[in-house]
Amino acid sequence: MLKKVFKLTVLIYSILSLPIGEDWMGLLHAQTITRGPYLQQLGQNGVIIRWRTDVPTQSLVTFNIDSPNNGGATTPKIELDNLSTTEHIVQLKGLQANTKYTYTVGTETKPLASGKDYYFITAPSPTDNRPINIWAMGDFGDNSTEVYEKNQTAVKEQYLKNKSNYTDLWLWLGDNAYCCGTDIEYQRQIFDFYGSNILGNTAFFPVPGNHEYYETATGQVDKKINYFKVISVPTKGEMGGLPSNTKEYYSFNYENIHIIALDSYGLDEGKYRLSDPQSKQYQWLVNDLEASKGKSLWTIITFHHPPYTKRSHDSDGEADLVAIREALVPIFDKYKVDLILNGHSHSYERSHLMKGHVGKSFTFNDYVHPTQWANGKYEKKGDSRPYINKDEGTIYCVVGSAGRLDWNGDPNPHPSSVYSNISIGGSLLFTINDNRLDARWVAADGVIRDNFTVFKNVNKTEKKTLEYGEKIRLTSSWKGSHLWSNGVNNQDFIEISPRKDTIISVVDSLGFLKDNFQISVLPQPVVLTEFPESVQVCVKNSVSVPFSVKNTQLDKWEYQLELSDANGSFTKPLLLGRTNKSPFQIILSDALPEGKNYRFRVRANADFFEEVPSKSFSIATPASLGFVGNKVMPFDTTLTLNLRFNGTPPFTYKITSLPEATTQARELSLKVKPTAAINYTIEKVTNLCGVGTVLSENSVSVLAPLSNEESSEKISIFPNPISDEITIENHTAKPIIGTLTIKDVRGKQVLQKNVSFNQSEKVLLSDLHAGVYIITIKSASLRFSKKIIKN
């Protein structure tokens, strides 16, 4: 059990006076740290410090607020655990948020680790609003080849050269120590490799990869692998997030960021992977996202196996990657996850800001899946553009080349990638500063080969109403450069005391961002209806009508929404609704006539308001379409189809066998040239109100063509109409030897037979249904067609 001690105790005499036994050997032995110290679970008010010694000793941490200007006046604090062990885990609690601490570890008789590398900065509160620096990478701890070892070394060195002053979070993306995540591999390829200048002050939050589970044959089921012995992660909701009660997956909050760490390879209950909706992990993920919805501005999820990847692993062909994409991407879309970080593929890949893609790579559509058509780069180069006002969509980053670097021979990156690199390793450094995220992929040669920036909740227009002479502070909606329209530069706020109505704007130096502040100074209260100009509104559709007020508070009054007549006059307005907040949500009645000069007007329940109606807009009605005239037509080489449209043009329509077309006309005659019996059927009609109604008069039938009766005087057929049998008489001098064919009016053949006769031939037609048919007789010297009717 831990106990707090607030002064150092000298034990020299006590130790020397005791008999030397096994319990005291650790105190008298020349103890040495063989691993660490390293930081775990660094949060707002606490941290876990771990280390390993060569012999069992007690565990003592001495810590203090780092205040360079206090002359060392504060008293260090001590956390002591007298239990003798080689695996030391000490938790510090009650720390101040957003504060730098220094620490040493050892025993009451001997410090074992101290110096400039051993410090940490606690997490800020959600309102502290300082930049959070994050380092992410996967597939890094591998010294099995010279290429991997050199790559890992170069990536580390370039991180140290390019990192910010302090790295708050180090995200491990799985396959952290090759080949199998054993204790000696973690020791040699992570703890020894990265050393105290990183591990002594940078808290890591890991996920396992498949290689962590390769340590044992049963690890996926029983979880008895070294990885879980190395880590101390927040499983009980200690740092926010939903408790998972397992080290396999967990979540936590860090300032305004919600981070979820998942296990994409272990098995729940010995059979369910993360992608299986029956797994506890899948269900926990959904519940955690639901519980955190709206509480953090940013959501980041880490796990090993990527849903989109090419050229190292292939997410088209590997079943576990397909399953993850199909099962998890809809969840990420639903909860508007901002960033997914993966490893597994030994490359770097960064996708569009995208949503809705669960199929194979060839189904990715540039016009469908990206939610913003931008490359994410915040720079004045070519078509570069950052992601502005990100809402829906997720960026997927594969950061799996911090050690291993492999190419499967496929030259083509995944179609969703904005940038992809298989030729050089690197790691991802990114900073979240309030509503701005800036990421850099720093390659092993120090070149920043990819970067992207995401802004949320920027480019705002704010309307302010002031008393005359009142001072107001205007603050921009982003972090970065600022050029104010009143000449102030390089600060994110200004304070002004306007004496008249004015508009103040602020832009960034690159021209992507702009806030507008519309300031009204006194006098008369005004209510403005802010419906867009020249839009077309469909009846029976929900309409949002926003409004605002000047020179008063909106919530002080009740308001009613009125509609003008079709000429824009409010002589006899139609009352549409009442509310005390903006916007109005209404549905226009389908009894309203079409018109292009309607206006909305919002009125307050006081007679001294100036009322500014909306600009003119149009009211439109849904489309409907049907044929007029004959619905059955005899065959001709050119026929006319008559159409009648109702609703607001233009109309887009589709008729069987004819191309889709658009018209402004409400009455339309179409010239068609059939070549056989056909049914012209209206398939659909649309206008700006969407899919319209196809009326019951939706089809015109054209009868089968009749050939020229070149020899009709030489052959007769009777009776007509017929009952069960017809007689064919030959009035020529030659016998008729050929074929007899009967077709219905749609051109479908119902009978064909060979005939050979001199004077007459009887044909039995009792099997035919009642209707109209075309009979054709062909021989070497004769062709004859005639319409017959079967009763």
Per-segment meaning from a language model:
Residues 105-115, 119, 181-295, 314-322, ...:
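Extended active-site neighborhood of metal-dependent phosphoesterases/phosphodiesterases
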Residues 17, 27-142, 146, 153, ...:
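Acidic, histidine-bearing metal-coordination/catalytic regions of metal-dependent phosphoesterases
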Residues 492-505, 585-592, 662-680:
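Solvent-exposed segments in extracellular or luminal domains encompassing
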Residues 48-50, 469-477, 542-547, 637-645, ...:
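A short beta-strand segment in extracellular, disulfide-stabilized domains
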Residues 485-496, 570-577, 658-670:
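Surface-exposed, flexible coil segments in extracellular/virion-facing regions
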Residues 478-483, 555-559, 647-654:
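Solvent-exposed loop segments of extracellular immunoglobulin-like
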Residues 459-461, 522-532, 620-623, 697-718, ...:
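Residue-level detector of functionally pivotal "anchor" positions at catalytic/ligand-binding pockets or at interdomain
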Residues 21-26, 483, 558, 710-718, ...:
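C-terminal outer-membrane/trafficking sorting elements
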